[in-house]
Amino acid sequence: MVSIAFYGGIPGGISTPITQQSEKSKCEENTMFQPYCYNNDSKNSMAESKEARDQEMNLKEESKEEKRRNDWWKIGMFLLCLAGTTGGILWWYEGLPQQHYIGLVAIGGRLNGSGQSNAIECWGSFPGCRPFQNYFSYETNRSMHMDNNTATLLEAYHREITFIYKSSCTDSDHCQEYQCKKVNLNSSDSSNSVRVEDVTNTAEYWGFKWLECNQTENFKTILVPENEMVNINDTDTWIPKGCNETWARVKRCPIDILYGIHPIRLCVQPPFFLVQEKGIADTSRIGNCGPTIFLGVLEDNKGVVRGDYTACNVRRLNINRKDYTGIYQVPIFYTCTFTNITSCNNEPIISVIMYETNQVQYLLCNNNNSNNYNCVVQSFGVIGQAHLELPRPNKRIRNQSFNQYNCSINNKTELETWKLVKTSGVTPLPISSEANTGLIRHKRDFGISAIVAAIVAATAIAASATMSYVALTEVNKIMEVQNHTFEVENSTLNGMDLIERQIKILYAMILQTHADVQLLKERQQVEETFNLIGCIERTHVFCHTGHPWNMSWGHLNESTQWDDWVSKMEDLNQEILTTLHGARNNLAQSMITFNTPDSIAQFGKDLWSHIGNWIPGLGASIIKYIVMFLLIYLLLTSSPKILRALWKVTSGAGSSGSRYLKKKFHHKHASREDTWDQAQHNIHLAGVTGGSGDKYYKQKYSRNDWNGESEEYNRRPKSWVKSIEAFGESYISEKTKGEISQPGAAINEHKNGSGGNNPHQGSLDLEIRSEGGNIYDCCIKAQEGTLAIPCCGFPLWLFWGLVIIVGRIAGYGLRGLAVIIRICIRGLNLIFEIIRKMLDYIGRALNPGTSHVSMPQYV
């Protein structure tokens, strides 16, 4: 510790150093020449009053500064809690199933039947279908106008299913004619050998009658149940069942579309709808989708297997047959046990689908009204308008599974009851979004959540007003664009209807042209006949011939039908041009509306786009609004502190350390100063130096003289210093002399060591070196948290700021939870108190202290 000496004078006019004595010094005989004499105990007691005042002033300043900081935190935390509460409410609202959700699905105007069956599409997760699962339906009693040209769901089913199998499978020629003969399969009970015999009267084997069919072109012979083939004109020519009713013939299909477990739906989009007429009180079911359809379910012989215990075992048989050329396809026999099986059409022969992973077989079973069934692997089947050559795997199915569905699936009768209608207008329709309807709500960038979040943010921070304006502007703009888009869609659909009418007229005109060509051919034949019979001098009406007139020679019928068709075609052309022109105008207006620049809205939109890029993966959820609000809040609340800290950091480590050391020195030496001692010393200096004490006093307490140096003393000549030392030594004892310090020499020594710099840098270097380090200790102090303004720990300061924010949020949350619990406890106590008082009141009423009721007495 550096000793500090005060220099003054004695009444004799000789200056003597007034020293601060150590703790062991006693008041000796030389104390009469000193202005005061005391030890540490008396010093502490005398400086107590000033220390208390300093502490009180420091506490007041710290409380004011803390209050200012708390004000920032209170405002910020209030806004943060407001945003969190708003976000929680919006999150809860978005997750609720709304009973009446106003969607973009719309029905308005008149419902007319439409023949545009290509508006019906396949929806589902299967490849080739639209990956969309939203559907709705409800009952209505609206009147609908349908005609014979109204498309049904059955037509679309045949088209879509056939397209799926036609595009997924390989073309086949299995629908050619077969030369078949009836055979019997005879087997002995003792062996697994079966003989194939040609007979006229066939008998059943394994529950079926059998045919041996030969396809000469492919050198292929198949042994097949009679139920799978159809005879042609009571001859030996047979074809697979269903070939005449289908136009697509395929084989080797992917297993995925043969399991019978993959669902799809045939759906439409507004302004088209599907209607199923129930015929009960003129009500109909209207929706955007028809019933669920499973891929792989056959048209005929549908059977449903239910129950846990189902087992099928292969019966291995050796088929003994005559010599043959090419391929001989033998049947695969099964014995199955079905505990619960249903025939959909009450047919004696049923078809079920047995499958495992990557393998499937269609079993044709004989329904014998018992749990034991004889089955054979089916060779052919019909799905939609596709005729399939069903797979026949060589490996038997071990892990057997059976498809389970309702008999109404893929039912032709039910699909034919669903008809396609089209509305002429678009109006909002309340649709239930509960789980039983299957309507799934999609989050939207600019919806109720966006508007509410923008309004809340606008009340919290001024920057969010721009976003709210953008949200409202974009909502109106999008609504206008949607209206124009609906008009474009309606006009386009109307134009397509008109084009369809034109196509029908063109088809009729083509038929008429074909008829005219036939008439010309007939006329040519007549001409040739006239030439043969020698008809001469003929006109277009009369012919002079010797042969009688024959009515079969032909007639030329005049008709005005062609002129009517031409007139209708011209009218339709005009309507199509008008409709398409209106659609083009609406589309242009939609693009103009959507691309109309708005300076404020465009700025906000760009800002929103940048924020969306900064926060990837959040999408259009409510988290985007909350994160945006938190970022803006942190930016506004932390930017002043960040800028202030940056300014202090860039101002240099010297000034930061200097302020830190000043504050530390002030707190360290405040308790050692004494008001009474200082006053006595000032009086002594005033009497000895003739007024120079005031100057010394000002210098001591000046801003640049805080470390105990005296510039007045430094400016005096060194001889004056020596004279003071010489005269002072004669008035102090040896003990006190040993404790006299030389502050000037110490200070000069440090000044010389500082390289001629100003005294402030020297004192800074002195203080840091006395603490045992250099300028890099500032960084250590910053990391330890002992430095108020860190010089190199700015990232650490930011991290601790984030930790403090999280801690304060958690603290406010816990305090809020405590308040809620306290309110709940008070409420429960109030309820219990009310119940107690009511019970007490009732009890007192029923059992009063003094009874005024006199009981009757019987004498």
From Swiss-Prot:
The keyword Cell cycle does not apply. The record marks R444, D445, H684, L685 as: Cleavage. One of its GO terms (molecular function) is structural molecule activity. It comes from the Viruses. Keywords: Cleavage on pair of basic residues, Coiled coil, Disulfide bond, Glycoprotein, Host cell membrane, Host membrane, Host-virus interaction, Membrane, Transmembrane, Transmembrane helix, Viral attachment to host cell, Viral envelope protein, Virion, Virus entry into host cell. One of its GO terms (biological process) is symbiont entry into host cell. Glycans are attached at residues 40, 112, 141, 148, 186, 214, 233, 244, 340, 368, 399, 406, 411, 483, 490, 550, 557. Residues 498-513 are annotated as: Immunosuppression. Residues 636-859 are cytoplasmic. One of its GO terms (cellular component) is virion membrane. Residues 1-6 form a propeptide. InterPro entries: GP41-like, Gp90_EIAV. Specific enzymatic cleavages in vivo yield mature proteins. Envelope glycoproteins are synthesized as an inactive precursor that is N-glycosylated and processed likely by host cell furin or by a furin-like protease in the Golgi to yield the mature SU and TM proteins. The cleavage site between SU and TM requires the minimal sequence [KR]-X-[KR]-R. Residues 7-614 are extracellular. The chain crosses the membrane at residues 615-635. Residues 576-624, 663-699 form a coiled coil. Residues 446-466 are annotated as: Fusion peptide. The keyword Magnesium does not apply. The mature envelope protein (Env) consists of a trimer of SU-TM heterodimers attached by noncovalent interactions or by a labile interchain disulfide bond. The surface protein (SU) attaches the virus to the host cell by binding to its receptor. This interaction triggers the refolding of the transmembrane protein (TM) and is thought to activate its fusogenic potential by unmasking its fusion peptide. Fusion occurs at the host cell plasma membrane. The transmembrane protein (TM) acts as a class I viral fusion protein. Under the current model, the protein has at least 3 conformational states: pre-fusion native state, pre-hairpin intermediate state, and post-fusion hairpin state. During viral and target cell membrane fusion, the coiled coil regions (heptad repeats) assume a trimer-of-hairpins structure, positioning the fusion peptide in close proximity to the C-terminal region of the ectodomain. The formation of this structure appears to drive apposition and subsequent fusion of viral and target cell membranes. This is Envelope glycoprotein. The gene is env.
